[in-house]
């Protein structure tokens, strides 16, 4: 009943009280002159997923750059963002996170060239004019509001605003009339639109983090109360949304870097403000950092289970693809003074300079790097969380680091009742060899647009597990909503094996048990699928290939090659007839997809049946 009344109150807030605050006719401020904007040869194309926006030119803040469609200038909560009607809200929001402003602020700081300060003022004034409070799609989502608050904070620090205000009268007026009013509007929105109950996932974390950072920096209304509220929320959610083993409960690997950054940034900003978080907070954050480190292969690639949307909390660079996991290893090494996070191939970067400054940089430089393969040449099992990572890593004189990496997923579907960012991937596995993805999760590609593709990417058949009767292991009720969650159960765990089952096909009369065993001496993985059927069923078993992998099948043996080099030999069960099946999709980054293929078998089963697959990683 609590959620029922929360939804009523939320509806009252978003459709009645918020509407009273709409002022679409708000006074338009004069745009400051910008020599960069006026220069026809000046361009900086900032990546927005598969597209770009030229941040050295005026920006249409409501344009979806992926379709050319524009979202309406109407009451925010009435705008349809869950269809293709106006295009992709996700692309609009990515522009309006304003993270490119931090890059512009850094350009100003490095050379004190006034043209970049002009450009900063121009864009933020333009944004305020185009986004009156509660008008337009950029006031729809609270996570977007809080990402802007965090961006505002770091821009404020980079520009050294208080000093700049005292020496630059125009900038002082800009801060008073544009920037601070925006900060206060964002802080008000953040507090008044909490994501609770079934929505209390990473969105709620962002809301507490953004409000906490704002209250640490600015004299927002009710500052002390807001600070207390936000800090308490962060302390609570870090324990609720992450297991004691440090695994995030949303079951979306790419989101881990996003969520870890919210908690880390809040802790760092709190330290600057003299506000320390508890030992339990820091202990759980360290466990999260340790899982993240174990989850990464020897090239810091992550297993792409669950949703991923290339979202970042803090981006000081020119945008584009960025391995924030590597950056976070540096951050955690410094924050915890823990050299186990300093892999040999991680480097100091601008993001960590913003977080820790010269003191942190000097600490990191003094810290010894972990030897290649050390601490990675071992399995990392998280039975409470349902994640199992098999690793064999060694240095080879000629070819460098060699690694066999397999991630096995026996985890819940996702977090809370809707499991928004989980995929129907029970008992799926992902294989990397020498840091190259070989057998892969299909990825994400989209949320609310291209509905057929959304259904494909989250489906059971798009993962390396057994699909029964062409159905998903859970029922998808919407793009980010699952019903009838399956439950996984770990049956047996040893040093080099795990066996687990799930009940996602109970209505089909089928129980699937999968055993994964790693023979480290032979560098061979054996996967045994056992099906107990109370009635006849049709099953499909795919092994999805990374687009860079080619495959050849001869009888019951498949050989997989990466860039022409033979990497893997698969012994396929002779009871099944495997073929190379085209027509699949792989999405390494949100908004991008490429065609892919899979080793694929289909058969009818009844009663008790077992299939064995042997995966031999070639030396």
Identify the function of each model-found stretch.
Residues 1-83, 90-92:
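Extended, charge-enriched "interface" segments that sit outside catalytic cores
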Residues 59-65, 376-378, 386, 527:
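Beta-sandwich/jelly-roll carbohydrate-recognition scaffolds of carbohydrate-active enzymes
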Residues 65, 99-102, 392-394, 412, ...:
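Short, flexible loop/turn elements at secondary-structure junctions
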Residues 68-286, 301:
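Aromatic-lined, polymer-binding surfaces characteristic
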Residues 92-93, 140, 145, 419-423, ...:
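Short alpha-helix boundary/capping segments
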Residues 96, 207, 288, 384-386, ...:
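Residues that flank catalytic or metal-binding motifs in active/ligand-binding sites
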Residues 146, 308, 315-318, 322, ...:
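CBM-like, beta-strand-rich accessory domains located in the C-terminal region of large
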Residues 251-439, 491-493, 499:
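Carbohydrate-active enzyme catalytic cores, enriched for enzymes
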